[in-house]
Regions:
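Cys/His-rich microdomains that often coordinate metals
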Residues: 13-16, 36, 77
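Short linker/helix segments within small regulatory modules
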Residues: 18-27
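A short beta-strand-turn-helix
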Residues: 43-61
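Thiol-based oxidoreductase modules, predominantly thioredoxin-like and allied folds used
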Residues: 44-45, 65, 80-103, 110
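Short pre-active-site segment immediately N-terminal to redox-active cysteine/selenocysteine motifs
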Residues: 58, 65-69, 112
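Conserved redox-active cysteine motifs that mediate thiol-disulfide chemistry
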Residues: 65-79
Length: 145
């Protein structure tokens, strides 16, 4: 029997389980029929989708607040992508462009980029700012999720 991977719906926040061999194929939420995000990928949600994830997702949500013009932010992108693949089913990783979503940056009191915030059950579980090594970042994320 194949292993199941948990995925939170961007539409309703419901937790769905996808068979490992079905990852990458089109899947829809069992509750609201919204297409599900592919597990193991960094998501770029809308403000509304992020609000749903923060409030309703059963999985912790790691938010990367970044800017396209920030070199340390770009340096962290492959590290985040690797983390999303490794922690698929245990952690959702999302990316928020602070220039495109200034209201979100303000709501989260983002003062520098990159800033990483882990949300669990609608509450902030931790935050850190600045680029770091893949090992340090993975240890930090694991300690909070």
């Amino acid at each position: 029997m194949s292993e199941k991977i948990k995925v939170s719906c961007l539409g309703c926040g419901g937790t769905n389980q996808i068979a490992e061999e079905a990852v990458g194929k089109t899947a829809v939420c069992g509750r609201c029929k919204t297409p599900l995000p592919v597990p193991g990928r960094v998501l770029e949600p809308t403000e509304d989708q992020l609000a749903v994830l923060i409030q309703k997702a059963a999985l912790p949500v790691l938010i990367d607040f970044y800017s396209e013009t920030c070199a340390p932010c770009r340096m962290m992108h492959p590290i985040l992508e690797a983390l999303a693949r490794r922690r698929a089913g245990n952690l959702m990783v999302v990316r928020v462009d602070t220039a495109a979503f200034p209201n979100l940056a303000g709501a989260f009191r983002i003062q520098a980029v990159p800033t990483f915030v882990v949300m669990r059950g609608g509450r902030e579980a931790g935050r850190t700012a600045g680029a770091m090594s893949e090992t340090d970042f993975s240890l930090w994320a694991a300690s909070l999720s």
